[in-house]
């Protein structure tokens, strides 16, 4: 395992616990981001279907509005100056609010009517019915345009956030988690190797002490066979063992 495949860390019990915690955190974060991406995808597909539906309806509404404009001009004549003289402010205005989807803020635009709604225009003696129809059709067109602008803004915002979220999910799934798993496996293998080395070292020390003890017992037996008083001899078994290092 090359150093690029894992994190550079000294193998120890503390490092093992640290890697386990980081791995658990990465897996939890991956799960949360995956759920967020799924929720955004659901809203994204819903907005896409609404955009298609609204654009289809927009074609019909704009066609009707254009026909109403031509009809009103044919009936009334040029009424632009009369409208400009009698209209002091716009009745249809736009307000915005915010919607939250899985932590993503989406701007929502909606149109509303400010003030009284009247179809009577001073100075127009004929064509009132056509003008009322014209105004109503263009109000519907403005409402749809505002709705479409809101949907497309949310569409672009969600598209960018989904791309970023998917990149993060892929990075955690294919880079971060595998690297943490390889690092944890490396630490475990190194600790196992250290345990085997320690076991082997302790076994060699025990074998060495057994050999020394057997030699001391043999020497003691030889002295006893020669009739030598062992009480006057130094007790070899009481001598301190020298340090055995490997």
Swiss-Prot record:
Keywords recorded for this protein, A-Z: Hydrogen ion transport, Ion transport, Transport
Pfam families named among the record's database cross-references: ATP-synt_D
Highest taxon, organism lineage: Eukaryota
Gene Ontology molecular function, alphabetical: proton-transporting ATPase activity, rotational mechanism
Subunit details: V-ATPase is a heteromultimeric enzyme made up of two complexes: the ATP-hydrolytic V1 complex and the proton translocation V0 complex. The V1 complex consists of three catalytic AB heterodimers that form a heterohexamer, three peripheral stalks each consisting of EG heterodimers, one central rotor including subunits D and F, and the regulatory subunits C and H. The proton translocation complex V0 consists of the proton transport subunit a, a ring of proteolipid subunits c9c'', rotary subunit d, subunits e and f, and the accessory subunits VhaAC45 and ATP6AP2.
PANTHER family: V-TYPE ATP SYNTHASE SUBUNIT D
Protein purpose: Subunit of the V1 complex of vacuolar(H+)-ATPase (V-ATPase), a multisubunit enzyme composed of a peripheral complex (V1) that hydrolyzes ATP and a membrane integral complex (V0) that translocates protons. V-ATPase is responsible for acidifying and maintaining the pH of intracellular compartments and in some cell types, is targeted to the plasma membrane, where it is responsible for acidifying the extracellular environment.
Family that this chain belongs to: Belongs to the V-ATPase D subunit family.
Protein name in the entry: V-type proton ATPase subunit D
């Amino acid at each position: 395992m090359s150093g690029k495949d894992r994190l550079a860390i000294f193998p120890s019990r503390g490092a093992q616990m640290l890697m386990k915690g980081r791995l658990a955190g990465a897996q939890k974060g991956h799960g949360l981001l995956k759920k967020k991406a799924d929720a955004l995808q659901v809203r994204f597909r819903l907005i896409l279907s609404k955009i298609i539906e609204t654009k289809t309806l927009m074609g019909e509404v704009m066609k009707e509005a254009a026909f109403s404009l031509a009809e009103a001009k044919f009936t009334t004549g040029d009424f632009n100056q009369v409208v400009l003289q009698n209209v002091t402010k716009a009745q249809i205005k736009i307000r915005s609010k915010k919607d939250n989807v899985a932590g993503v803020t989406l701007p929502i635009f909606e149109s509303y009517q400010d003030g009284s709604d009247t179809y009577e225009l001073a100075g127009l003696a004929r064509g009132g019915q056509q003008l009322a129809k014209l105004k109503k059709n263009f109000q519907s067109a403005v409402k749809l345009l505002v709705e479409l602008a809101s949907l497309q803004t949310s569409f672009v915002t969600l598209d960018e956030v989904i791309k970023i979220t998917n990149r993060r999910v892929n990075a955690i799934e294919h880079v971060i988690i595998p690297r943490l798993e390889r690092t944890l496996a490396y630490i475990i293998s190194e600790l196992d190797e250290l345990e085997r080395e320690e076991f082997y070292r302790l076994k060699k020390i025990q074998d060495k002490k057994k050999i020394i003890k057997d030699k001391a017992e043999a020497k003691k037996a030889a002295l006893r066979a020669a009739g030598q008083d062992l009480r006057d001899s130094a007790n070899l078994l009481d001598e301190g063992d020298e340090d055995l290092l490997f």
